[in-house]
Every structure is written in structure tokens, then in C-alpha cells.
Amino acid sequence: MKHVRIFATLLALLVISVTPAVIHSEDVYREVTASGAHNLTLAVDNPRNLGGADDAALARDVAEVLRFDMTLAGPFSVMAPPAGTSPGGIRPGEFDLDSWRNAGVDLLVKSGYTITGDSVTMEFRLYNATQGRELAAKRYTGKRSDLRRITHTFSDDIMQTMTGERGPFTGKIAFVSTESGNKEIYLMDYDGHNVQRLTKNRSINLNPDFSPNGRELAYTSYRRGNPDLFRREIFTGTEAVVSSHRGINVTGTWSPDGKQLALAMSRDGNSEIYAISRDGRDPRRLTTHQAIDVSPAWSPDGKRIAFVSDRLGKPQVFIMNADGSDVRRLTTSGAYNVSPRWSPKGDRLVYCRQEGGFQIYSIATDGTGDTRLTSEGSNEHPRWSPDGRFLTFSSTRDGGEAIYVMRSDGSGQTRVYRSKGKASHPTWSPRW
């Protein structure tokens, strides 16, 4: 019932009023950055009380969430209100926008809250201080406990306004943690808040992967003594076995249409890549080789699958058609390359290379542009955000193993969660 209530709460987030979207959002970006000399300076003003009780903690939390999201976003140099700017209200004409422009601000976020019992209404407004005009205005109503999600939603709206594509900030990250003494699967906001435990089977659970609609997770569990593949409905907790053949049933990943999963199975004595229906029927063997083949990853159009094979002596990343034909090697540098994952745009893959510890690399689908993204500690399990702008991964750089996020070019590496045990195998949900 807890998960049902969570789902109902998410559905209850109601957009009360929405101003028309900016049609030429890329033009807005060009207007503000016409000089090409700097990132956008984005100021987040402190939220104002628009009615009802004061709540300083609420105002602080909203500002912190917005600043964190926009700092990670990258095109923005994020700042608190600079000296000499007009506080005033939040709507056009209620404050001096020129004072913000004169303080070097390109973009300004104003917000306010109204508290009524357990309900809070948040109003957000985005201004182009350089051009002296409003770009977006949104109002949301929800429970006090919904506040972080409401704020992340407006961060997504800012990205939509400025780039033409929504941000990923309302997404969740599923991951594995040993905090309970076992490897269990957990779920959290992308920034490490609102952590909840999903599995409680006191066993080893690995490699969670979100379904395309974000409502299910596929994962491998040893709960019955064999590494079997399960799928779990996130909001109800309902589970079903997908593959329990003798031997391994691991690294399961969903096809883009959600009808199949690709996984590695050893049902025939050797680890090979298979495709199987979501209910476990009709397994189709895709690779036929005496080497070990594991870690399949679908291309976003569903036409190709990347995977790892040691058929040339050491693990390397290969690509094949979704029916198993036309196998070709992708990685040619490094002696040990694993854990590939296709970008949502389909133009690149990320993977891990062993260099003492593991480091994360990004490579184009034709094998060019092989670029190292990490350097500190050992870094594994890279997974893309749904918009392809960011990655989540695990790292040991601060001692232990924790969950991080970064931009897709390797910049902005930020720890978002560190548990009492080890945290690993993160995966970013589709947009909910």
C-alpha cells in the first residue's frame, strides 16, 4: 500500500496554471549568450511568502534544490541574490528587473509559496534579465512532502524553456546498497533525497534496470540460490520471475518498446546473449560463441545491441544487430572494457575500462572519439539520464563506494548519495 500511496501522490501534483511556452527557446538562449563569452549567469532569488504561514525551512529548501539542479545543468553560473538587487515581489512590475541585469544577472528565478494546512502552492517565474522580459511562469499545488519534486519539476521546465528539451531532474535513481547487511535495491531522487528500500529478501540483488515507462525494474536476485532475473512493479511491489534457467540469468536490460529483455544466460553451458519476452517466454539465443558474452545494452531504436565478449582474449565491447547478426568490435583501446550503455540519442556509448581500478569512457558508435570521463578512484556502472545530458555512476574516490552524477562530457562530477555500506549499480529512470 505504501507504494500505491506514492504513485497516487505523484499523480496528485497538479499544474494549476501554465503560461504559454516560449516558442523560440533556442532564440532565447542565443539572445542571452550573444557575446559567446560566458555561461549564463542564473540567479535564484529566495522564495517569498505569498499568503498563509511563514516557513523559512521551506523557502531554504526550494532555493537549495533549484541551485543544485541548475549548477549540475552546466550552461549556468548559479548565484544567490547579489547585493544591490531589488527583492520586491515575484510577478512582473512588482520588482526592479533592471537592478538584476545591472548586477550581471542573465536569468532570474523568482518564486513564492502559499501554505494552507498541509497543502502548499508554489509559483515560479523565469525572467530574461538581459532582455527585460518574462520567459515562463508556472504554479503547482501539492502536499508539503511533495515540495522537492515540485521544485525539480520547475527545473525541468527551465531546461525546456532554454533548450527545447525537458530536464531529467524529476527522475529517480535505483541502486544497490549493502546498508542492511545484504545487497538490496533502493530508490531515491536523482539528487540523493527520499531514499526508500525496495527489496527485502536478505540476499544478493544486482543490476537494476528501469522499463521504458519507468514503472518496473528488472534485476537479478540470488534469493532462490540461483542468479535469476526478476521484474518488479515499483509502485505496488508486485514481482514476477522472468528467467530462472539453471546457471546465470544476469544483466537484464529492457528493449525500448518494453516487450523484451536482453540478458546473459548460461542455460546451454556457456554465457551467451539472449532476448526473452517480458513474461519469460520465447527465449532467443543471439550469440553463438565459445567465449563469454555478457552485459547486453539496446540501442534506443531497438535495432542493435552492444555487449561484452572475451572472444578475442580479453573483454571488449561489441555491437550486433538485434537478431544477432553482423557482430563487430567497438572498443579497440584498453585490455579490459565492460559495462556498455547506449545514449538516449543513439550516437554514443559509455563503458568502463580497467586501468588499475575502473574508469568511465565515452565512445561514438563508429569507434571514434574514445574519451575518458573519470580519473579519481574506481568508477563503474555508468548509466544515462533520459535526456542524455548526464550520467550516474558509482565511485570509490571518497572511500567506500557511493553514487555520483556528472554531465555527459565528464564535467560537474558530484556525489549525491553515500550509504552506511557500499552503494553501486545506479540506473536513472525515464521521465515520470
Swiss-Prot record:
| Signal peptide span | 1-21
State the organism named in the record. Answer: Geobacter sulfurreducens (strain ATCC 51573 / DSM 12127 / PCA)
Q: Does the keyword Cell cycle apply?
A: yes
Subcellular location per UniProt equals:
Periplasm
UniProt record similarity statement: Belongs to the TolB family.
- GO BP term, pick one: cell division
- The protein here is known as Tol-Pal system protein TolB
Q: Main role?
A: Part of the Tol-Pal system, which plays a role in outer membrane invagination during cell division and is important for maintaining outer membrane integrity.
Quaternary data: The Tol-Pal system is composed of five core proteins: the inner membrane proteins TolA, TolQ and TolR, the periplasmic protein TolB and the outer membrane protein Pal. They form a network linking the inner and outer membranes and the peptidoglycan layer.
Question: Which NCBIfam families would you find in this protein's record?
Answer: propeller_TolB
Sorted alphabetically, which keywords does the UniProt record give?
A: Cell cycle, Cell division, Periplasm, Signal
Q: Which InterPro entries does this UniProt record tie to the protein?
A: 6-blade_b-propeller_TolB-like, PD40, Tol-Pal_TolB, TolB_N
List the Gene3D superfamilies: TolB, C-terminal domain, TolB, N-terminal domain
**Cystine residue pairs:** none
One Pfam short name? PD40
Q: Please tell me one Gene Ontology term that the record gives under cellular component.
A: periplasmic space
